[in-house]
């Protein structure tokens, strides 16, 4: 076991809040492997970079010799985490939860060392609960305590319904820490109430309470709202090397440093040296390129990272059209407006986005900037269509019989 002040500082780096810091330092000074727990409800099949902030911190604990428990909340996912919700979440089927859980395991081992990771499912102990067990667990806390939680309080004061089972969610998540005898639990800042519930329940059941370490919610590509698939401002870890590389290169320099701080495997000292080099004249674009290659290599490999970099240079810095660009075919009865066409071939998410991109001067057809979203491209021809810097398609428009 490595126990040094520098190690403690590195483990705490990037955390938004640690409760309480002295207890973490005391646990680390014991010089024995600690049980580090992080729970994930498999409510969606794919992870994005926002999820990996937590996974990166778990990886750090592994590197310093601690035992990491990757907890899949297959039982609690069927209830639905009410955190941040103003309506009751619809529960998922067991089949959906288990299918999502399989993909989670495949994805997380791109970051975590499988030989140093214990994968647990909370159904292993929660399925054994009977009515008496559940009532005893519910009796450990009051409704008043539950209403201290912001989202519950807002729903209560505005007359929005709160289902009884939603009060059970934080209790069941907290009980996971009892079952696993966790020393430390990691989670996002939005999980603070649930994480502290683990501490309270461990005390109730006679165990030493866990330390809670909260990581920040990372901003999406827009630099404003948190990274989310529903907001389409995310970088998925299962995306292609070109997509990951291109999306990272599209972010602002300010957001780049935020991503590097939370997502790079570089140490705090190495990152500080990078920042200093930029202050001394290094182009931040070069730092961004190196970071983009690091992330692509993590989820693919180094060769793919170099290829993605080369393709990016060819496509965007030199303005070249990739030779291997696949041609799409669109068969229509009569010409359609460009705004509708862009959505139909998935270059935009909606017609309104198409109109906005055209008005911003971000749409080109065969290299010419288009200003009219109602423009209709003639049938029987092929076109190179570009939206912004990263979206490009070769399209053949054909006449329907």
Curated annotation (Swiss-Prot):
Gene3D superfamilies given in the database record: HUPs, RNA-binding S4 domain, Tyrosyl-Transfer RNA Synthetase
InterPro entries given in the database record: aa-tRNA-synth_I_CS, aa-tRNA-synth_Ic, Rossmann-like_a/b/a_fold, S4_RNA-bd, S4_RNA-bd_sf, Tyr-tRNA-ligase, Tyr-tRNA-ligase_bac-type, Tyr-tRNA-ligase_bac_2
Annotated binding of ATP, by residue: 229
Domain of life: Bacteria
Catalyses which reaction(s): tRNA(Tyr) + L-tyrosine + ATP = L-tyrosyl-tRNA(Tyr) + AMP + diphosphate + H(+)
Top-level class of the enzyme under EC nomenclature: ligase
GO cellular component, one term: cytosol
UniProt-listed Pfam families: tRNA-synt_1b
Coiled coil spans: none
Keywords for the protein's UniProt record, in alphabetical order: Aminoacyl-tRNA synthetase, ATP-binding, Cytoplasm, Ligase, Nucleotide-binding, Protein biosynthesis, RNA-binding
Single Gene Ontology MF annotation: tyrosine-tRNA ligase activity
Motif 'KMSKS' region mapped to chain: 226-230
Residue span, S4 RNA-binding domain: 336-397
Matches recorded under SMART domains: S4
Its EC number(s): 6.1.1.1
Residue ranges of the motif 'HIGH' region: 42-51
Subcellular location, record wording: Cytoplasm
One annotated GO biological process: tyrosyl-tRNA aminoacylation
Quaternary data: Homodimer.
Family: Belongs to the class-I aminoacyl-tRNA synthetase family. TyrS type 2 subfamily.
Biological function: Catalyzes the attachment of tyrosine to tRNA(Tyr) in a two-step reaction: tyrosine is first activated by ATP to form Tyr-AMP and then transferred to the acceptor end of tRNA(Tyr).
Protein name listed in UniProt: Tyrosine--tRNA ligase
Species for this entry: Legionella pneumophila (strain Paris)
């Amino acid at each position: 076991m490595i126990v040094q002040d520098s190690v403690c500082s590195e483990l705490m780096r990037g955390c938004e809040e640690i409760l309480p810091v002295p207890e973490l330092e005391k646990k680390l000074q014991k010089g024995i492997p600690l049980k580090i727990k992080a729970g994930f409800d498999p409510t969606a099949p794919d992870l994005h970079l926002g999820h990996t902030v937590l996974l990166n911190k778990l990886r750090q604990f592994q590197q310093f010799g601690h035992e990491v428990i990757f907890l899949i909340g297959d039982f609690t996912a069927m209830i639905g985490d009410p955190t941040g919700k103003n309506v009751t979440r619809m529960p998922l089927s067991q089949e959906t939860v288990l299918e999502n859980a399989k993909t989670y395991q495949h994805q997380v081992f791109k970051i975590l060392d499988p030989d140093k990771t214990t994968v647990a499912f909370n159904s292993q102990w929660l399925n054994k609960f009977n009515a008496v067990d559940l009532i005893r667990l519910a009796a450990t806390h009051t409704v008043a305590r539950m209403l201290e939680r912001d989202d519950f309080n807002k729903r209560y004061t505005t007359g929005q319904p709160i289902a009884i089972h939603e009060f059970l969610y934080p209790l069941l998540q907290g009980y996971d820490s009892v079952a696993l005898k966790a020393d430390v639990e990691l989670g996002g800042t939005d999980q603070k109430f649930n994480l502290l519930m683990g501490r309270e329940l461990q005390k109730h059941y006679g165990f030493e309470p866990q330390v809670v370490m909260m990581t920040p919610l990372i901003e999406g590509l827009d630099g404003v709202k948190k990274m989310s698939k529903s907001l389409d401002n995310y970088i998925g870890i299962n995306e292609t090397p070109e997509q990951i590389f291109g999306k990272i290169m599209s972010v602002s320099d300010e957001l780049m440093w935020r991503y590097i701080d939370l997502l790079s495997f570089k140490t705090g000292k190495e990152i500080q040296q990078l920042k200093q080099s930029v202050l001394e004249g290094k182009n931040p674009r070069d730092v961004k390129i190196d970071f983009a290659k690091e992330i692509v290599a993590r989820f693919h490999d180094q060769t793919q990272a170099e290829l993605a970099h080369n393709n990016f240079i060819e496509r965007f810095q030199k303005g070249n059209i990739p030779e291997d660009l696949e041609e799409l075919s669109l068969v229509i009865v009569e010409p359609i407006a460009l705004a509708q066409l862009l959505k139909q071939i998935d270059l935009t998410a909606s017609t309104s986005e198409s109109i906005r991109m055209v008005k911003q001067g971000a749409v080109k057809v065969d290299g010419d900037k288009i200003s009219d979203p109602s423009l209709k491209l003639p049938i029987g021809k092929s076109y190179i269509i570009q939206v912004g810097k990263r979206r490009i398609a070769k399209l053949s428009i054909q006449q329907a019989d």
